[in-house]
Amino acid sequence: ITSSLEQYEPCEVLFYAAEVLAKLMGSKDVAIYTVANRSYARLFSATSEKARSLGNSINYSEMDAMYTVLAGKKVYINKNMDERYPLMANAIYSEDEMQLILMIWGIPWERMTLGQANMLTVIGYLIQNAVVRANRYISALEQQRYIKGTNILEPEAFLALVKAYLNARDKGLTQCALLSVDTKENDRDEVGKRLIKLLRQSDYVGELEGGKMYALLANTSAKDATMVRERFEKEGVSCQIQEDVFV
């Protein structure tokens, strides 16, 4: 498992961990949420519409039945088939901090057993190192690779993220959109600041070759991207939806 994940760039690992998990658990419906703080987690990758059903952001601390079990570092099994929860879930920890929540649907009742729970625990341990390392890499990327004095990612770092997201989108592991932003030489920093205020924590602003500015919107469908673009335009940020990057 770990070797199959190690073939990917660090910023791709979390996407393909969902694919590996789905294969090993024999389910088409798997989601991975990254824990943002002690209450909220954000959807990072999902293998189906069903796996996206809880939404892009969840208050996991209020999902009592599941949270209590995960906080005790055990696998949650949804024995009551409560539709508000996945059928099984497991949390990945690093130094006693919850980092990720793995969620599974699409498995028959007879497979929701202690044996499967143990298997999910083992898979969690196996992908933990690759995934925690990838998570740290992305955090470091965000901290260290900004263009000096701005919150705009420099081209090499931004291109790696964009390619990872677009490849994962093409494989159905995530939804995302890329907006090219119109800037002039003298207002780039101002537009960048305005843009960052309009974006969510999970989105990115960066430059590609030639100094062109882009916004990468995570967990955003084509329909949502159109609405985001319209909202940006109203705030004075002119942009277009870009289908791909040609670099």
Indicate where each model-derived feature is located.
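Short regulatory/linker helices and ligand/cofactor-binding micro-motifs at input modules
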Residues: 1-12, 145-152
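Structured interaction and signal-relay segments at domain junctions
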Residues: 6-7, 16-73
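A short, aliphatic-rich beta-strand micro-motif
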Residues: 77-78, 85-93
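Short hydrophobic/glycine-rich mini-motifs in sensory/regulatory modules
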Residues: 92-103
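Short beta-strand-to-loop transition segments that serve as allosteric relay/switch motifs
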Residues: 101-111, 217-219
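Amphipathic alpha-helical "output/dimerization" segments
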Residues: 111-132, 138
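Active-site-proximal structural segments of metal-dependent nucleotidyl cyclase/transferase enzymes
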Residues: 158-183, 191
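Conserved helix-loop-beta segment at the catalytic/binding core of cyclic-nucleotide signaling proteins
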Residues: 185, 192-224
